[in-house]
Amino acid sequence: MAQTMLLTANAKVDLRSKESLVERLKPKPLSSLFLPSLPLRFSSSSTNASSSKFTSTTVALFKSKAKAPPKKVAPPKEKQKVEDGIFGTSGGIGFTKQNELFVGRVAMIGFAASLLGEAITGKGILAQLNLETGIPIYEAEPLLLFFILFNLLGAIGALGDRGKFVDDPTPPTGLEKAVIPPGKSFKSALGLSEGGPLFGFTKANELFVGRLAQLGIAFSIIGEIITGKGALAQLNFETGVPINEIEPLLLFNIAFFFFAAINPGTGKFITDEEED
């Protein structure tokens, strides 16, 4: 009897040891690596108690990629307008430098013609047009006053001076200037462009001379309205003489204004649209 009980006890121990060995050899789930291990044998009461106390934590294996911050786009820079004058684009009534150049050329021709006419006839520009002179300025013809004001404002660039003149590329100098290129005329050896003007004025110089002519014709008219004398008589030049007896300096000035008016200057005129 005692031997039977001993064998039974040994069998129970062997069974338990075998059972524990089988459980050890069983593959463990992946969650056991991250979650705390629980006892295999537990009662229902202990299960309820432990489940109420146990809280699982979620572990992220892969993190979401952080979004890159949006790139800041710099606002486009406002392009400056092409301005090259006294009042700038904001001033005046919309004249461009090309318009001013045209008005200046007309003023040069008019001023030169008035000087030549006064030198030959002895009459000022207003007397040649049979306009009343030798009166106060406020009694002058309104159209004549407008003409004076227009020339004065044009001479200082107040009519609008949008745009600018750009010079042509610099011609070669030194030995390159002295050598005549193949197929070119003798004009190239003198430093003059093949198809350009003979006179060495740029359009910016031409505009300056035109403004001087506008000032000259405006002040000569103002002086003649008040004094009754023409521009040459106010400067004590001899007038009413043949053309061959006119003062050489006066003839040079007349020829200069005529030639500057008809000879196109070098360079080109650019505006805001051409800059874009």
From Swiss-Prot:
Belongs to the ELIP/psbS family. Seems to be involved in non-photochemical quenching, a process maintains the balance between dissipation and utilization of light energy to minimize generation of oxidizing molecules, thereby protecting the plant against photo-oxidative damage. It comes from Solanum lycopersicum (Tomato). Pfam families: Chloroa_b-bind (PF00504). It is found in: Plastid, Chloroplast thylakoid membrane. This is Photosystem II 22 kDa protein, chloroplastic. Sequence repeats lie at residues 62-168, 169-276. InterPro entries: Chloroa_b-bind. It is a multi-pass membrane protein. It comes from the Eukaryota. Its main location: plastid. GO terms for cellular component: chloroplast thylakoid membrane; photosystem II.
